[in-house]
Curated annotation (Swiss-Prot):
Similarity comment: Belongs to the phosphatidylserine decarboxylase family. PSD-B subfamily. Prokaryotic type I sub-subfamily.
Top EC category: lyase
Enzyme Commission identifier(s): 4.1.1.65
Catalytic residue list: D90 (charge relay system), H147 (charge relay system), S254 (charge relay system), S254 (schiff-base intermediate with substrate)
Site for Cleavage (non-hydrolytic), residues: G253, S254
Keywords, sorted A to Z: Cell membrane, Decarboxylase, Formylation, Lipid biosynthesis, Lipid metabolism, Lyase, Membrane, Phospholipid biosynthesis, Phospholipid metabolism, Pyruvate, Zymogen
Cofactor comment: Binds 1 pyruvoyl group covalently per subunit.
Catalysis performed (reactions): a 1,2-diacyl-sn-glycero-3-phospho-L-serine + H(+) = a 1,2-diacyl-sn-glycero-3-phosphoethanolamine + CO2
Effect upon mutating S254C: Reduced processing, 16% wild-type activity
Protein name listed in UniProt: Phosphatidylserine decarboxylase proenzyme
Organism: Escherichia coli (strain K12)
Cellular localization per UniProt: Cell membrane
Subunit text: Heterodimer of a large membrane-associated beta subunit and a small pyruvoyl-containing alpha subunit.
Keyword Iron: no
Length: 322
């Protein structure tokens, strides 16, 4: 009965206005009130502040600053094996496995369309048909920066407007096509393991989605699909990220979906639905063998992006809308 009530609220509540209100409140500097809210949040969700670079909650001027708090470098070591792809986020695995032609498993008895997830982009979908996927859910207590599973060259980013349903286990099991309905940012990379998509999915109360190369992607929520492209390789204007490097962040909890091309990687056998994930731990292994490179993988970045700063895109000249 309680679950039915919670699901009904997902359809009834004004999710967009709630999200805007939450984003507005989380960006305000309110002194002792901000600290009180953070302390209550830490206690309720059992947040481990010992892992944070700033464990003192009084250090955060806004709730958003606290929410995207950086971790100490040593608490998330990155697996250095060049054949291993690592987990992109702290959280739990919602689902993982093989993409069956165009079908991705959302929950037991519920599939959704790969092409719908990719906003109808059939050319991009063709890269991943019969490939592999991993869906990682970030709860409110988790670290909310998202990192690279492997070295990658950014080729395309698509912002897709959509609903703002919660993305917890209850909604995943009961809301059809949840991840293909919600607002999301699709990032396509060239990697040593073939093409890889890393998709940041929005949800109720998620105030914004950001990337390290373009700053805040949403808000504003303009209701139109936007697309950006970048050149390959070492060409001028290209964006290269290293394994373990931060690529984006959420302000409040959400979901990351990774897509891998067919025949390129095998997921770690021990992983299953509800497995706990930690950034830097093994997620998948290449089907080929690579020689260990001289360069070390990037540690967790120490440099901060201001929590309330809406950075201008670094590649405005590459932007076009569709």
């Amino acid at each position: 009965m309680l679950n039915s009530f919670k699901l009904s609220l997902q359809y009834i509540l004004p999710k967009l206005w709630l999200t805007r209100l939450a984003g507005w409140g989380a960006s305000k500097r309110a002194g002792w009130l901000t600290k009180l809210v953070i302390d209550l949040f830490v206690k309720y969700y059992k947040v481990d502040m010992k892992e944070a670079q700033k464990p003192d909650t009084a250090s955060y001027r806004t709730f958003n600053e606290f929410f995207v708090r950086p971790l100490r470098d040593e608490v998330r070591p990155i697996d250095t094996d060049p054949n291993v792809l690592v987990m992109p986020a702290d959280g739990v695995i919602s689902q993982l496995g093989k993409i069956e032609e165009d079908k991705i498993l959302q929950a037991k008895g519920h599939n959704y369309s790969l092409e719908a997830l990719l906003a109808g982009n059939y050319l991009m979908a063709d890269l991943f048909r019969n490939g592999t996927f991993v869906t990682t859910y970030l709860s409110p207590r988790d670290y909310h920066r998202v990192h690279m599973p492997c070295n990658g060259i950014l080729r395309e980013m698509i912002y897709v407007p959509g609903d703002l349903f919660s993305v917890n286990h209850l909604t995943a099991q009961n809301v059809p096509n949840l991840f293909a309905r919600n607002e999301r940012v699709i990032c396509l990379f060239d990697t040593e393991f073939g093409p890889m998509a890393q998709i940041l999915v929005g949800a109720t109360i998620v105030g914004s989605i950001e990337t390290v190369w373009a700053g805040t992607i949403t808000p504003p929520r303009e209701g139109i699909i936007k697309r950006w492209t970048w050149p390959a390789g070492e060409n001028d204007g290209s964006v290269a990220l290293l394994k373990g490097q931060e690529m984006g962040r959420f302000k409040l909890g959400s979901t990351v979906i990774n897509l891998f091309a067919p025949g390129k990687v095998n997921l770690v056998e021990q992983l299953e639905s509800l497995s706990v994930t930690k950034i830097g731990q093994p997620l998948a292994v290449s089907t080929e063998t690579f020689v260990t490179p001289d360069a070390e993988p990037a540690p967790l970045p120490a440099e901060e992006i201001e929590a309330e700063h809406d950075a201008s895109p670094l590649v405005d000249d590459k932007k076009d809308q569709v």
